[in-house]
Amino acid sequence: GCGGAPSAPTPSNDIRVQQALDALNQFRRDKGLTELVYEKELEELTDLLISPFVKEGKPVVDRTKFSSYVDVKEDEIKQALSNKGYPIYETYFTAGLGPEGTDKLKTLKYPTDEVQKQNWLTYMSGGINMAVKNLRCFAMSVRSIGGEDYFIALVVGEKVPH
């Protein structure tokens, strides 16, 4: 898996997941960063990630409830990562969620133009300052919410060997 072993092909059956991973790794190679390895066991965490943003199949727009949902889910995700043996940093994971409130949902949409795509790739590599240096493991799922496709991606550091 992403503990340094050779990378297996993406197990996801969605071609868009493979395309996103390929694009990310190309971007990372160009920047001299390590490539990401697909990690199947992280896919379930994408469910936790998307849950605050969706209610009954529609995007959530109630800002007041929203931030408390997100905090709860972030704690759950941190706990789940920790349980699975992944390191928790100050910037412990980079999810396909932008920085601002319900606008976060917009950053989950797969980028349609080149500028958006570059922003997504930069964000998924730890932001402008590449804050998380040793990102290694990637998982992603594609969801249709209110008739639009959203990409829920998670990037974390390498597992800590026991």
Predicted region positions:
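Short, well-ordered surface patches within globular domains
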Residues: A8-Q79
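A well-ordered secondary-structure block
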Residues: S68-H162
